[in-house]
């Protein structure tokens, strides 16, 4: 899980320009990290590229926090 978390954290920091310390498993992309809907779509696309997977629109809608993203990635690998 640490590897996925580190990789997800790097993508979030790069994409949203937030401090790495703010990227916790409980952090919500929109409420805590200031992402808008377009940011979330772009994050999902970057996660797909980084982890070489496809995330369905239905699954993407369920990914609201950093922990959701990490858990989803770990469940698919």
UniProtKB/Swiss-Prot annotation:
- Domain of life, per UniProt, equals Bacteria
Q: How is it modified after translation?
A: 4'-phosphopantetheine is transferred from CoA to a specific serine of apo-ACP by AcpS. This modification is essential for activity because fatty acids are bound in thioester linkage to the sulfhydryl of the prosthetic group.
Q: Does the keyword Lipid biosynthesis apply?
A: yes
Q: Would I find Flavoprotein among this entry's keywords?
A: no
Q: Give the sites modified to O-(pantetheine 4'-phosphoryl)serine.
A: 37
List the signal peptide residues.
none
| Residue span(s) of domain Carrier | 2-77
Pfam families to which the protein is assigned, alphabetical: PP-binding (PF00550)
Protein family: Belongs to the acyl carrier protein (ACP) family.
| Protein name, entry field | Acyl carrier protein
For this protein's source organism, the top of the classification is: Bacteria, Bacillati, Bacillota, Bacilli, Bacillales
């Amino acid at each position: 899980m640490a590897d996925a978390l580190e990789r997800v954290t790097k993508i979030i920091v790069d994409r949203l320009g937030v401090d790495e310390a703010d990227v916790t498993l409980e952090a919500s992309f929109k409420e805590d990290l200031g992402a808008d809907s377009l940011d979330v779509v772009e994050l999902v696309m970057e996660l797909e590229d980084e982890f070489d997977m496809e995330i369905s629109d239905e699954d993407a809608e369920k990914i609201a926090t950093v922990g959701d993203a990490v858990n989803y990635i770990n469940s698919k690998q």
